[in-house]
Each structure stands twice: as C-alpha cells, then as structure tokens.
C-alpha cells in the first residue's frame, strides 16, 4: 500500500478520478477535492451565528470573532472554509434564512457560477488572454527610472517598435510621462508631443497599442490616433477619463496607486488597513464607476500597481497572493520589470535586474497574471512561454 499527496487543483483531481475509473456521475466528486476559502466582511452577530451553524451542517466550517456566540459584539468578519460541493449545500440552506443571508447565498451562487473572461473585448475587436501576454514598454521620456532618454528621437523610437514587432510582442505600451517615484507631472501638450511619432509610426503594423497616461486630454489624442487600451495609473479616478473611455469603448487598465508619483512613496501613502482588502475595495469602486460610464466589464484589466504606494514587503505580499484578485474574473496585468522591489532583494542596480525580473514575472503568471509588462522583450516573451507551459502541463 502506497499513498501520495495530490495538489488540490481541479484538473489534477479530475485526472485522478478518471484514471481510477470512477463512474461518470462520480466525476462530480472533483468538487470535493478543491478547497475554497471565502471571507465575508461585516456581518451582524445574529446572522454570523446562523451562518456558522449552516456551514457546519453543510459539511464545512466558518470562523467568527470571539464574542459572536453571546452576541457581545455587533459585527464580525466570517471566514468560510470548504469546497465547491459544500458551498453548494450551504447556498441551498441559506435560501431559507433571514438577516440578509438569503441574499448572501445568491451572491455566493453567482460567484461560484462566474467564469473568468478569456477575452478582452473593445470597440476594435477582441484580445485573446487564454494564454499569458507580453506587453513591451516604450517610454518616450527623458527621465523614466530605467530607460529614460533611450527612446526620445524618431530613429530610436522607430527602431524600438520594429524590434518589438519582429520579436513577437503582444502589446506595445507607449508612455510619454515618467511615473517613477517623486517625479513631477507634465502638461498634456508635452506628453502628446512625446508620444505622437510613436503612435504615427506603429500604425503600419497590426499591433495592439496601449497608452500609459492618466491625463484625459492625452488619452483622447491617443484614442483618436490608434490606441486600443488606456493604461491609467490613477485607476480611473478622473471623471473626465472615465467618460472619455466610456464614449470610445476602448479597453481600460485600472491600476491601484495611493497618492501621485510625486508623493506615493511617502509614509502616509504606504499605509493600509489590509493591503489586499483595501486594493480589492478600490477596484470594486473603480469598476462600478467604469460600468456606470458605459465601459464594458469585459473591456477591463486590473493592475495592483507594484511599486506605486507600496513598500518592498507589501509588493511581495501582493505578488504572493495575486491570485486573490482573480475573484473579479478579469485579466490581471503585472508591472514588475526592473523595479526597486527587485533591486532591494538582490542588491542590484536598475541595469542588472534581468534575472530578478524574470523570476518575479514567472511567479506573477503562476499566481494569476495574464499580462506582464516588460523592458526586456526577448526575455519577457520567453518568460511567458515557459510560465504558460507550466500552467498547461497536465499528467
């Protein structure tokens, strides 16, 4: 007799059930083999008591704050721990409950049934994200933290675009304003001046073009000149930007940042109650704002904003638990390339962070990133290929 520990992965468990030779109906047991943990916040104590009992009756468990049983506290968060099968039983039991638990059951049901978007849809078509994509950085700026002044002449910009297209990049991200820590903002006129040639030159190629800007005037120019995606580091907090993108039906990347590039690394802007939940709440508000402006849900991309108002430790917490943001069922973009979070760990300057970048980007993809944003194109494309091969490797 031998025993083996199996990874609680849907495809892994399903494979073993089929290999064992179970009856076809018994393949549904795969639901029992994949653990599922869901945190429900701010539930009143009476409802939490019922939720805990119904969870236990469903074959799972619920952790609540001390004092809930006696109702000596008003509210608690509840950690529900089970698997797909037990959650389905819980949902049925909640359908007969009060104190808002019936509505909670409906929300849990929608969550279990929801499917991740494998396509980004927008006014010009569809971007397939069924496999990870590589976004190449083109900073037409004199002061970016890594490649400032490298691509400021028309010859250099053209050569960079030609190189990225030849190597097979999936998306080109053009930026005309540096967002490095402590950088100053510039006028939209100057930003447009910097990106104009790149937008004109890239039109000869059948290429998905993203423009990295938080200025709606720059975004308007970019969209009128071929841009497909607006990559907004301010997370669609500007009503003018939201309205513009809603009218154009472009794809939108919502990035999280506290403060502005000039002050985002100040102590006040790296403080969180809980960094994962705080960013989750930020995304929820930004997504609602976008939907209300007419931006399609499947047109959205999320970026937790590595290095934007985060300490080194916070960046790695986000990298480790990036998959938790897949609860939105939207593509995730990871912008880690050459950043100080890498240099701080390996003690290398910005020009010697390639190996660290490859490692971090691989981790990001394995933890849920659908798009990685890179300076080093060849290595970025190779990273995507290897990580995708790992993800699709089955027994």
Task: Set out the residue ranges of the language-model regions.
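N-terminal amphipathic alpha-helix/helix-capping segment at the start of soluble metabolic enzymes
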Residues: 1-31, 50, 75, 88, ...
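Active-site-adjacent loop and "lid" segments of alpha/beta metabolic enzymes
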Residues: 3-10, 46, 50-53, 57, ...
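Short glycine-/aliphatic-rich beta-strand segments at the starts of folded cytosolic domains
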Residues: 29-43
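Conserved beta-strand positions in the central sheet of alpha/beta enzyme cores
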Residues: 37-40, 63-64, 79-82, 95-103, ...
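N-terminal capping/lid subdomain adjacent to the active-site entrance of alpha/beta enzymes
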Residues: 39, 43, 53-151, 155-161
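Catalytic domains of carbohydrate-active enzymes, especially glycoside hydrolases
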Residues: 159-175, 367
